Design a protein with these regions (language model features):
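The Walker A/P-loop phosphate-binding site
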Residues: 3-119
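Helical mechanochemical/support elements of P-loop NTPase systems and associated helical scaffolds
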Residues: 18, 41, 45, 59, ...
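Conserved catalytic network of the ASCE P-loop NTPase/AAA+ motor domain
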Residues: 53-56, 83-88, 112-115, 145-151, ...
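Conserved inter-motif catalytic segment of the P-loop NTP-binding fold
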Residues: 66, 86-179, 184
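Conserved NTP-handling cores and scaffolds of large molecular machines
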Residues: 83, 87, 113, 144-148, ...
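A structural signal for short, well-ordered beta-strand segments and their strand-loop junctions
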Residues: 94, 156-158, 206-208, 245, ...
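Phosphate-binding/switch region of NTP-binding enzymes
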Residues: 180-320
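Terminal-proximal interaction/regulatory segments of ATP-powered molecular machines
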Residues: 328-381
Length: 381
């Protein structure tokens, strides 16, 4: 008996599709596939650091170090400053998780702070005085989300993770047994909630923390596994885009009136310092690199203006071989001199000694701006 073979019409002749489950997911689940981040470069304020590190909107930056006055908080505020200068319709959140930041230090940032939600407008920083982790994390996630849908951009800074505590640990009290959650657990919790929206909504996150031993109230409880040299633990190295480690300031890092002598309050004043920054994690293959950023003292210098431009520029000119060393003499490349002349800027061919080069740049704003543009063009190639 002959078998009947059914002939399919063109409409019926369809292959099984693997797209159905994905299409259903995209229709029903929470995702960020339709939100394309701009990944705009945000300056660290330092030409030296920016010459290699390319921090962008959507990233989270960790600033760690052992000790105070290393420059962690100051650098964090510079990131907030430059984010608000770069991103349209932007403002910032500052989570004051520790009570140590004085009004004087806030004034030093050059930023406009407010505690009043009605005054939190474009270009300002709202201070949140709280250290309870869960509501802070939720608030940041919700604020970043709401800002995106309002056509705004948000930078946020937690200063510091060491000051945060979980709600359950707060309820235990200071005398109850057991360990409270350390920074590694808090960091992991934060990144699980915030990493994706922060990236796709072009926010910028800055987190400071110190080196610290694990908080341990019960002396008989077993030691936890070692999770890394800093209080940020392994989660920082794996989940942050950049981790900058600020080194202890030694006498050799000080910038003095006379660097050949010891500092003295009256006869050899401290003019500034070199903040040494080691990259523990990077998005640009610069992990392990060390950078020295010159910082100048003085109440008149605020925010990113605390970075000593003439020192940075001189070092970069030598590094990029736009200025050549020959004994004590420093000679500008002839091409640079000619390019400057076409723009109405006259540059000396030779200068005797690095200190005189610093002074020459400091005293000639037009020359410094011209050379800064040249360096920026090389950095951005």
């Amino acid at each position: 008996m002959a078998r009947l073979i059914k002939t399919l019409s063109p409409k019926e002749d369809k292959k099984p599709s693997s797209n159905a489950a994905l299409q259903n997911f995209l229709k029903t689940a929470t995702h960020y596939n339709n939100v394309i981040p701009q990944e705009t470069i945000i300056s660290s304020g330092s030409l030296i650091l920016d010459s290699d590190a390319q921090v962008r909107s959507g990233m989270i930056v960790r600033l760690v170090g052992k000790g105070s006055e290393l420059g962690k908080s100051a650098q964090g505020f510079v990131f907030l400053e430059n984010y608000m200068k770069t991103m349209p319709n932007s403002k910032a959140l500052y989570i004051k998780a520790e009570g140590r930041l004085s009004k004087k230090k806030l004034d030093k940032t050059g930023l406009k702070f407010t505690y009043n939600i009605e005054d939190w407008t474009e270009g300002t920083v709202f201070i949140v005085c709280s250290n309870i982790a869960e509501p802070i994390f939720k608030m940041i996630v919700d604020t970043v989300h709401d800002a995106y849908h309002a056509g705004e951009h948000i930078a946020w800074m937690i200063d510091s993770m060491d000051g945060l505590i979980l709600e359950d640990d707060l309820k235990k009290g200071v005398t109850s047994g057991g360990m409270v959650a350390g920074v590694p657990k808090l960091t992991k919790l934060l990144f699980r909630h915030l990493a994706l929206p922060n990236m796709h909504y072009d926010s910028l996150g800055v987190i400071t923390s110190q080196y610290s031993a694990q908080i341990k109230i019960d002396t008989y409880s077993p030691n936890a596994p070692n999770q890394g040299s800093s209080s940020s633990g392994s989660s920082a190295q794996h989940q942050a885009d950049y981790v900058f480690e600020y080194q202890t300031i030694n006498q050799g890092d000080l910038i003095l009136e006379n660097n050949a002598l010891k500092p003295d309050k009256f006869t050899n004043k401290i003019l500034g310092k070199f903040a040494r920054v080691k990259v523990l994690k990077s998005a640009d293959d610069i992990t392990g690199n060390m950078y020295s950023v010159p910082i100048r003292r003085g109440e008149e210098y605020k925010g990113s203006n605390q970075i000593w431009r003439s020192y940075e520029l001189a070092d970069l000119l030598i590094g990029y071989e736009l200025v050549n060393k020959g004994g004590a003499w420093l000679t500008f490349e002839s091409d640079i001199i000619e390019d400057a002349r076409t723009e109405g800027v006259e540059i000396l061919e030779k200068i005797n000694g690095i200190n005189k080069l610093y002074a020459y740049l400091e005293e000639n704003e037009a020359i410094m701006e011209f050379l800064k543009k040249k360096i920026l063009a090389l950095i951005q190639q």
